[in-house]
């Protein structure tokens, strides 16, 4: 897995998650995959592509997501044809949170011919916040994502929280 537990934590106690982008496969068969963690579950693999469900049932109205992160940005050196313009650019990590009134978890498909990624402009989204970093952050640094509510009359049914070692991991 590209996501592993680590004892290297902001407080020096407990555990954290270490997300890494690396090649997953045997020999030349496989693909570059971003380390990630998310609320939801992995459904299945189709070829070398994933099908996931984003979200867990949730009906509260938080105002922010707080945490700590550190990140080592490296130069992008592999990409599919669609994102070749990124080669030579620094990779970017991503964290986002969304509250929505979906009737079920949000299905994500990474296969290019059947791609369905998370859309932060989805009309079901009630509140959203995100952050990106394309610079290396060598020490644990606090972050706060202030949720921007688009509608205060609707009640959330799901929460989606995603952290990825590579914002463009679905395109490698």
Show the residue positions of the predicted features:
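Short amphipathic, basic-aromatic surface patches that mediate peripheral association
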Residues: 69-86
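Aromatic (Trp/Tyr/Phe) and Gly/Pro-enriched flexible surface segments
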Residues: 1-66, 88-100, 106-150, 154-172
